[in-house]
Each structure stands twice: as C-alpha cells, then as structure tokens.
Amino acid sequence: RDTDRSRGLGDVYKRQEQEQGTQRTEQGQGEKPEPESPEEPPLVENWDLIEITRAEVGNSNYEELLYLASLAGLVNRSSPEIFLHSGQAYVKWMTEMKASGYTFTKKSLSEITSLFLNRAKGYVLVDDKLEKTYIAASLAGVLDAVILTTDLASKAPYNSLQKLADVRDKDEAWLADYIKQHSSQFNLNAIVNNASFPWTMVDFAIANRYPWCSNAKSDDAVLQKLYYMLKPNSPHYGWGVPYNLERMDVRFGCEHNGVYTVPGINTMSLSILSSKQLKPYDRPASPVEVPARTGVHYATIVFSDGDNTSYMLDLFSRNTYISHPRAHEIPLTWMYPPTLRTNMVPVHNWYQKNLPATNCYVGALSGAGYTFPSHHEFVADYFRMTNGMLKDCGMQYMVLMD
C-alpha cells in the first residue's frame, strides 16, 4: 500500500461541484436496501475489528472525532483494527467484509482510548477551529502522533502524552519546507486534501504517511512546490484546491508533475477499506467474444460520477442504480474508477460480483483518476499506468474527458 503509486483514492462522501453553478446531490434516500450479496468463501480469518459510529463520538466542533481518526490511522497502519463510520453505506461494506472473514465488535471512545492510546508517541496540537488539520495530519503520520486540540490535550488521559509539535501558528509554506527537510519520512506517492470535513481521510493519510495540502485556498507557488515533491503521476486524494473549482483544481494538478485527482471528501476508515488483508475479487473475463454487427450504429447510456468515490460508496450501491432489479434488462455502461481495486476493496468486490451480464464497466475520468490529458505533464506514462489498472479490473475501455 505504501509504495504503489498507482493507487487512487479510495474514500465516503458527497462531492459538490461548483463549476458553472452545477451541484450534484444524492438521490434515492427512501429506497429500501438491496438484498445482501451471496457470501464468498472467507479470504481472511479471525480479524476482529472495533466498530464505532460518528454519532457515538465527538462534540460540536468534532475535536474527539479528529482525535479518533488520527488514532485509527496509527493503529490500522500495521493491521486493521478500528472502523469509524457514519452508518448508511458503511454498514453495507461491513456486510461485505464480514463475508470475507471479518468480525466487528462495538466499543466506546473511552474503551478504544484505553486499548490503543499507548500506540501514540505523543500528540500534535491543532487549533480549536481545526483550520490547521492539514498540517497536523501531515506531521502526525511521520511522528506517530495523534491530533489534539488545546481542550482535549488538557484532559486525562490525553494529558499524559508528550506534545511533539504545535501547528496552531503554522501555514502551508511552513509545511512545504518541513516536508522538504524531512522528505525521507514521508510517503510521497500521494497527497491528500479535504476542503470540507477535517476529520475525514485523516486515518488514511496518517496510516500511509501521506502529506496534506491546504484545506483552504492554496498559494499557487506553494502548492506547485508540494506537487513537485511527489513522484510523477501521483494521486491527489480529495477535493478543493487551489480554487475549489473543478477545472482549476484538476487542471492545476495535471499540469504540475502529472498529479491526478481522485475525488472524495467525506471518507472515513479508508485505512480499513484499503487494508492489505482484504483481497480483491476480479470478475472472470467473458469466454466468448460477441461479434460486432455490420451496418449498425452502437450507442449506450453511460452513468457518470464514476470518478467520485463518495458516490461509489453510497449512491451507486442503492437500488436506484446498478443494484436496481431491472438494471439487467437493457445494456448500460457504468463508470468505475479502477483505483477502487486497491483503495476500497469491498466496494470493488461488490461491483465485480454484481455487474449484470448485459452491462459493462469502463474506467472513469480519465483513467486512474480525474485529469485533463491534453494538459497532463507526463501523459504517456500516466496512460501506461492506467492501462495496467484497467486490465486488473477486467476493463477494456475508459472514459476520456478533456
């Protein structure tokens, strides 16, 4: 997980696109959940995860939720243990994981703290408004630390921890210099950003020691400096920099070191969903090639938002879309990010098992992640990487958007 640069984000969320005033919102809230898919033979044995929901944690400013997410990142780095979720879609993926040999035990925040706080070497102090979460998460990963606000740090049992860093007065320029000076400690195969929810994706970033960029408008020069510290053709997980506008956000990355975007802003427990202990299930290739008819124009309906892992985790798994009982009646095409195969393994496995025979998957925009090929700095290498990922998922085609 830490060395494969072809991983694209995986995460759970809702993406709001502001380009041209367009906004996508979830639909089908009243749909009944679809039946559970048939159980597969267990792929792992005796993995007992601790389950805790977002509603059971935190207060109005989410300081406890941020702390727990940072602790989960440290703990899940070596083996999957803490599954933090918000219910709804996550319960579905828990069901999928149970079929692979996982069990879940509910525990409270205090119980989890007593079990795992000793895994942290100390804490990183963040401002009470959580505006510097991106700096704190960057440092917490390499310092093996949890993230605490001033209020939490003054309370037991957290006050027994050593303060390893205080980022309340730091900015993104300071962070860029820190990453450059300590580059060997970071995993520079990816960068993370979250413009809307400071507690989400924290576990994933800390578990993998990924750096973060700002959760506000970034300075172009500083962001460019951060992007060129990464390995070429690395993913940017999240959404929202530098201008919180789709074209500028995506285009800026692909123009600078081939950084491609894997959208998703509300993801929790990605360190669990991408666990190496979960094995991807790949749909066997069709043994028969269907010959094309001559004199016929082929067309298909393509369901989009397949690049947005928020939708892949939740909306597309409802009865409204690919799991609808009548989806098999006509040929349909579904955009599917091949990065799910390693970043959100239960989600990938569900899509692979539940594709109707009349339907097909194509790689999402534009391949491994969201990029504009005509602006992509290392586009040839990017598509070579994408081609391998598509083959792993049994796909022959991808959607190109420029």
Task: Briefly describe each language-model feature range.
Residues 18-23, 27-29:
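Intrinsically disordered, low-complexity repeat/linker tracts enriched for polar/charged residues
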Residues 1-16:
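Single conserved hydrophobic/aromatic residue that forms the stacking wall/gate
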Residues 300-302, 332-335, 361-365, 397-400:
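Structural recognition of the beta-strand scaffold that forms the well-ordered cores
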Residues 291-293, 320-327, 343-366, 389-392:
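Acidic (Asp/Glu)-rich catalytic clusters
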Residues 14, 32-341:
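Terminal accessory/targeting
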Residues 364-379:
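C-terminal regions of proteins
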Residues 219-220, 311-323, 343-351, 376-389:
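Well-ordered, non-membrane alpha-helical segments in soluble/globular domains
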Residues 225, 235-251, 378-402:
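Catalytic domains of cell-wall/extracellular-matrix polysaccharide-remodeling enzymes
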